[in-house]
Amino acid sequence: MDYAKESLRLHKEWKGKIEVVATVPVENKDDLSLAYTPGVAQPCLEIQKDVEKSYELTRRHNLCLVVTDGSAVLGLGDIGPEAGMPVMEGKCALFKEFGDVDAFPLCIRSKDVDEIVNTVALLAGSFGGINLEDISAPRCFEIERKLKERCDIPVFHDDQHGTAVVTAAALLNALKFTGRKIEDIKVVMSGAGAAGSAIIKLLIELGLKNVIMCDRKGAIYEGREGLNEEKAKMAAITNREKQAGSLADVLKGADVFIGVSAPGTVTEEMVKTMAKDPILFPMANPVPEIMPDLAMKAGAAVVGTGRSDFPNQINNVLAFPGIFRGALDVRAKDINDPMNAAAAHAIANLIDESELRADYIIPDPFDPRVKEAVSAAVAKVARETGAARI
């Protein structure tokens, strides 16, 4: 199938992938008086007395905002907020279908950090959570940080944390399959943007000790000249031996390669220099850092990508619907690192160790167990860490 051509045809037919639907009947005068004036005044007064009642008396308890500025849409780059709308609508559809979360797209005509933060923060009282999407680095880090400071509802940048959760889940199972422990392995990350940073932080939360991050100039380490603020922060928690050199240099002896960078950055020869039975997650889209067949030919034990036409697709839809479902169910004030770690374990544990195979380390996104497992794990840890309101 020509997905581009067929998708364009269907988008013209659909004229949007989401809609607002009334949940109550408005078929007579009594219905009208209850859903709207004069009866609606009473819930308004209740919320005036206690804003928390907005979760009980409105749809806020199940409503999320999906926010973009259109600056980093898929692999298309800075295409603008209006052009990002089809992706945001699609995201909202996935929220509903995979998490039963009502989501609304907000495409903002600004790239100014403070304008975006102020716009979203002013709207936060109408929503139970905020999902940031397709905002370019390093601004995405600052936007998320400032919104977390200003908002008392979860703020979640899916390009960072959703990717990190599913990558971590896949790695946990790949380590089981190859007989390794996370505290003993060496990981090399290609890509120092939003996703790469979040993946490393979550893996460290899960026990990883030895990890080297690379950008276009090679290994990142403390003291390397020209690092921006975010890369300097990553240098402080990675590459403790301050190993310098190219990606090829630091990949020697590594157990795991994770790529969120560019096509063709890893060769068969580089894979052959890694530890025995290496794990490779080349996730650049649509063309990965190395094609799976080449990685396997060079000795890889497990390969996962971001593509649905290869085994072991590392797909964010396994994470964000269940994470938000769990957070909303307990009226969470935040989605913290332990909650993300719990989501990763929940996804990984859906596959019994006896069922693991080289081509089956991560559940299918359509597995009906995913939402319940992830949401329950996230809600439990939200309560344990004090992030839950109820």
Regions found by a protein language model. Name each.
Residues 105, 131-134, 155-158, 189, ...:
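General beta-strand structural signal in soluble alpha/beta enzymes
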Residues 1-155, 375, 381, 385-389:
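N-terminal ligand-binding/catalytic initiation module
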Residues 150-164, 280-285:
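Short, acidic/small-residue loops that bind anionic groups at enzyme active sites
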Residues 74, 79-99, 157, 161, ...:
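Glycine-rich phosphate/diphosphate-binding loop of Rossmann-like nucleotide-binding domains
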Residues 158-159, 180, 282-390:
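Adenosine-phosphate binding glycine-rich loop
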